[in-house]
Amino acid sequence: PPRQKRKAAVPAHGRYEGRKASATMKSLAGAYEAIAAWGVVPEVCEMDAYDWSDPQGKTIVLTNLVALPSGAWERLDDFVRKGGRMIATGLTGFYDQNMHCILMDDFPLRRCFGAQISEYKAVAPYFTIACDTPATTLPAHLWKGILRPDRAQAIAMHGDDVVGTRHRYGKGEAVWLPSLIELGGWHGDNKGVADFYGTYCRGQIDRAPLHFSRPADGVLMRLMESPSQRLAVLVNKRPHAVEIGLSRPLPASARRLCGEASPRGTSVRLGAEECAVFLWDKQAE
């Protein structure tokens, strides 16, 4: 269905979204949606199935991964130290696999993040965070995680509290924003979350052969290719027409196989609920 603001009234019994069993999966879905708004396809992967052997230039996202098993700690530290970027949000790393809190005292990823948790505070069902890098306002839900930076740079504030950091560690970087920003965006305006992921996943976005030049909420693009051709499928799930900015113009020889959309330079207009398919030869790029 077309994306709408999904903000609901706080239940009388006080069981907020962030306390429900679905919070982790909805956080993952919110991050996926925010990255997909740039016209790219993020990969969802189970930790043991992920290839950790070559982290250089790669980015992983841990969205509200409340239980972080001890077997993953060294892999995550190595991933960043050897050139990867790790983004952690929400209550990621609150427990280990035995439900022991690992954020207090000797946090195993403290050197990697360059910071540690001071405390989590319940603020409001929905509130906003001021982010410096990128310069945007992030929606958040229920809790804010307050950080005590060691060597990390503060990138987000809530009042006088540091609630987001980035830290160069070895050859890589760790970005930590321990508030439920994906759930905040899920129930409200997701633009700030899309801007956040657009900044910290920029390398992966720019490596795509074609992507959106600005986030397009409710629009998806998928690319397929053969050795000689490329095919782009664009779907607008909004109830109204949208103008999509592309990272580069489609080749003049691109053929429209489906839909009514016509590209004009670096933009394409899609009607309400429209699907458009374009095919072109790679040598024309």
Regions found by a protein language model. Give the residues of each.
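Aromatic-Pro/Gly-enriched surface loop or interdomain linker
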Residues: P1-G57
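A conserved amphipathic helix/loop scaffold
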Residues: T63-E285
